[in-house]
């Protein structure tokens, strides 16, 4: 970052989390924190995990950019560890052997301790081991991934670890803000199981708009064929995907195709009609087949049709958009050898919050060096964001989740809409006023309906901005400016305002104005081509996810929280922007570095790699995942079933998935049964953790299940469960409360249609 005042400047983080979750500390470092990694003499084992170049693991480098190292062996060096912790603000640790946490907290009662374990510190699975594949199985994603009639398909990469990292960073920052307000530290007990579930594809949170308000727990038991929602077609040089959803998009597609008469009727404006039509899909295929990906994209832009070519990762990182935004930067990983790595995921005040240095060499003896700033924090409160006013202009998943994260921790979040342009999350197949997913994802908010196209509505909104602390949005770049709310206007109305916006490709660059539905962004970032069955390049199966929406919301919330922390020491606001495509690619750091090594003709070494086994179990479509990490796991597995995968499959087929999971975990092998979303609330570990709880809504007939607590904490209360608002449900009260308007003034706004009040 070239900014002279990054938002977390002066915040000190002690990072004792090895492996891929080192990304938590790296992200906090990109936002400006001083991060010191703790590792034993000789270096941590994660330094040489996976692909290595000259003995340096690329995954290690990706997770630890910008950190320094303190070499500490516990318990022998306990005094040195306590001395470092005494000077820290946040301690990240993952069951660090030899750690005397009581001594650490006695030395620094204001320390925020984030203790991370695979399954939490209570419940029957508390001592079990997880892997990315195991977490996919246990968080509901695996059961939906793949094609009908086929075995489930493990998603590519390390999505559960990589999405959990920003969720944990968010919890750490929220607890730190609470510390700044109260002077008291905290200990968060974070279960990776929950963090991954919440930030990837939460079964009891917001789902994509194509679900039409139907939550994931109401979907069919098996894997359903969702490819018609976001269909992929072969073209002259590969594949392209269309996302023709809105009527205006269909009209653009119809004109582009030459207005074929067989599709001219008004019924084709309706999404269900188009979804059900094999003839329409065949017509799309014939029309697109002669064109290249670039020609399809150009034609789609000209006609207002959402479309994207399918890229592989090497193509994705070289697009004009990524080059223009400096999304990747070279980092020296060995003497004289530099490789490309993701250059952060957030723009702060128009400047990239990117790489702050290489990964550290082993053997360091780092001490904290950053100056201690003075923070002018709000008065103490039970919730970290109590008293904070948030204008939530976000839509669908990213926007909805960003606002809810603040609302759940005490902020007054006002969802800004208009009756003529409601949030697409409100749509439901039964035309209910509040869908189940909307009710889950917008709890604890107030509703304001305002006419932002009128001069009086604009002026009223700027009056609200003047009293707000945070403004969230995820429109296509330029939308707020077109309404008269550009960055300068907002800052003039309120110099202390913090803004956070999220878009498909970011606010700058040649692709900034592209229509950016998640399925298209996944194509442009290389993920769609990877989410296929081995050896079957056309078995595309990524339609079951809304990734990266939920994790992008966490990244945006973290950026906003960081700017609020900066505001406590400077008095000024700021802006954060997130590109969802860059979020995806940033979570492929080691893979991108390996591609750079390959392009440079460098030879990578790979030791023993973890191997994920998908084991069919007794029952109907029942499976268990096992991850064989090393020789010890192979020996443990051999002691149960023999060394061959075929023998393991035969053994598993005679047992229930619960039995297979339990026996493998008892032998020390990471394993997880394939859990369906509908079964998660009754899972013994989720019950022990208190992950879910029942909720009600006055417009929904029966109680329903939602996420409860995000983690266990000594000081952070569980979130409230105030019902999600109808459009404009609180309009009159909001303008009266925020602006001090009397009844006559509010009545005039209502009478003139400047604001709307739900009946």
Where are these regions (language model features)?
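Short, hinge-like loop/turn segments at secondary-structure boundaries
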Residues: 52-57, 129-135, 206-207, 325-328, ...
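Residues on a specific face of well-ordered alpha-helices
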Residues: 136-140, 166, 170, 174, ...
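The feature captures the short pre-catalytic strand/loop hairpin that immediately precedes
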Residues: 139-155, 527-544, 714-715
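Cysteine-centered functional microenvironments
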Residues: 151-163, 394, 540-550
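Acyl-CoA thioester-binding alpha/beta core of soluble enzymes
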Residues: 1-46, 61, 71, 76-94, ...
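N-terminal Rossmann-like NAD(P) cofactor-binding subdomain of oxidoreductases
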Residues: 91-143, 454, 473-529
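Conserved N-terminal Rossmann-fold NAD(P) cofactor-binding segment
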Residues: 30, 39-78, 418-459
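C-terminal structured domain segments across diverse proteins
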Residues: 402-407, 428, 435-450, 454-468, ...
């Amino acid at each position: 970052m070239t900014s002279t005042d990054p938002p977390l400047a002066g915040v000190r983080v002690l990072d004792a989390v090895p492996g891929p979750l080192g990304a938590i500390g790296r992200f906090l470092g990109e936002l400006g924190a001083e991060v010191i990694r703790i590792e034993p003499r000789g270096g941590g084992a994660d330094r040489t995990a996976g692909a290595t170049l000259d003995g340096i693991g690329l995954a290690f480098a990706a997770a630890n950019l910008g950190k320094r190292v303190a070499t500490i062996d516990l318990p022998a060096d306990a005094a040195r560890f306590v001395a470092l912790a005494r000077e820290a603000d946040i301690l990240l640790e993952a069951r660090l052997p030899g750690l005397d946490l009581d001594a650490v907290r006695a030395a620094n009662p204001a320390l925020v301790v984030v203790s991370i374990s695979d399954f939490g510190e209570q419940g029957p699975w508390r001592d079990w081991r997880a892997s990315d594949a195991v977490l996919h199985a246990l968080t509901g994603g695996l059961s939906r991934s793949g094609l009908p009639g086929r075995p489930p398909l493990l998603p590519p990469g390390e999505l559960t670890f990589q999405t959990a990292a920003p969720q944990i960073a968010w919890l750490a920052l929220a607890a730190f803000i609470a510390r700044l307000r109260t002077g008291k530290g905290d200990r968060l007990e974070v279960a990776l199981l929950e963090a991954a579930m919440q930030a990837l594809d939460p079964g009891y949170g917001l789902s994509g708009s194509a679900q039409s308000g139907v939550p994931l727990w109401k979907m069919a038991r098996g894997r359903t064929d969702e490819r018609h929602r976001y269909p992929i077609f072969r073209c002259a040089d590969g594949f392209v995907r269309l996302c023709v959803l809105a009527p205006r998009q269909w009209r653009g597609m119809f004109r582009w195709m030459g207005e074929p008469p067989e599709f001219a009727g008004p019924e084709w404006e309706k999404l269900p009609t188009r979804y059900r039509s094999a003839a329409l899909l065949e017509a799309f295929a014939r029309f697109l087949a002669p064109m290249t990906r670039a020609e399809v994209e150009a034609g789609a832009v000209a006609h207002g049709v959402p479309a994207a070519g399918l890229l592989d990762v090497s193509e994705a990182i070289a697009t004009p958009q990524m080059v223009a935004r400096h999304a990747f930067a070279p980092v020296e990983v060995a003497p004289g050898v530099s490789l490309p790595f993701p250059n952060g995921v957030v723009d702060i005040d128009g400047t990239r919050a990117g790489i702050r240095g290489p990964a550290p060499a082993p053997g360091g003896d780092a001490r904290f060096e950053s100056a201690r700033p003075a923070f002018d924090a709000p008065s103490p409160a039970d919730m970290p964001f109590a008293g904070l006013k948030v204008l939530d202009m976000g839509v669908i998943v990213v926007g909805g989740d960003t606002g809810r994260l603040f609302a759940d921790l005490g902020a007054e979040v006002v969802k800004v809409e208009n009756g003529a342009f409601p949030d697409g999350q409100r749509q439901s197949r039964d035309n209910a006023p509040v869908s189940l997913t909307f009710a889950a994802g917008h709890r604890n908010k107030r509703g304001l309906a305002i006419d932002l196209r009128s001069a009086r509505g604009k002026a009223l909104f700027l009056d609200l901005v003047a009293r707000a602390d945070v403004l969230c949005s995820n429109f296509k770049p330029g939308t707020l400016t077109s309404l008269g709310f550009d960055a300068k206007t907002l800052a003039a109305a309120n110099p202390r305002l913090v803004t956070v916006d999220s878009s498909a490709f970011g606010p700058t660059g040649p692709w900034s104005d592209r229509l950016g539905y998640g399925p298209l962004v996944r194509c442009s970032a290389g993920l769609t081509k990877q989410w296929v069955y081995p050896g079957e390049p056309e078995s595309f199966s990524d339609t079951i996810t809304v990734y990266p929406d939920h994790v992008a919301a966490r990244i945006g919330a973290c950026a906003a929280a960081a700017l609020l922390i900066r505001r406590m020491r400077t008095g000024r606001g700021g802006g954060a922007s997130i590109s969802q495509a860059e979020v995806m690619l940033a979570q492929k750091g080691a893979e991108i570095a390996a591609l750079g090594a390959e392009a440079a003709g460098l030879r990578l070494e790979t030791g023993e790699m973890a191997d994920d086994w998908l084991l069919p179990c007794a029952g109907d479509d029942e499976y268990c995942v096992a991850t064989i990490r090393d020789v010890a796991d192979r020996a443990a597995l051999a002691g149960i079933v023999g060394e061959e995968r075929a023998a393991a499959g035969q053994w598993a087929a005679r047992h229930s998935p619960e039995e297979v999971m339990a026996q493998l975990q008892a032998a020390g092998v990471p394993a997880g049964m394939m859990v369906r979303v509908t079964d998660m609330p009754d899972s013994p570990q989720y019950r022990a953790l208190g992950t879910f709880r029942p909720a009600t809504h006055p417009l929904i007939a029966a109680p329903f299940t939602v996420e409860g607590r995000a983690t266990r904490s000594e000081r952070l209360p569980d979130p409230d469960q105030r019902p999600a608002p109808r459009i404009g449900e609180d309009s009159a009260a909001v303008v009266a409360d925020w602006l001090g308007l009397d009844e006559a003034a509010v009545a005039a706004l209502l009478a003139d249609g400047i604001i709307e009040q739900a009946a």
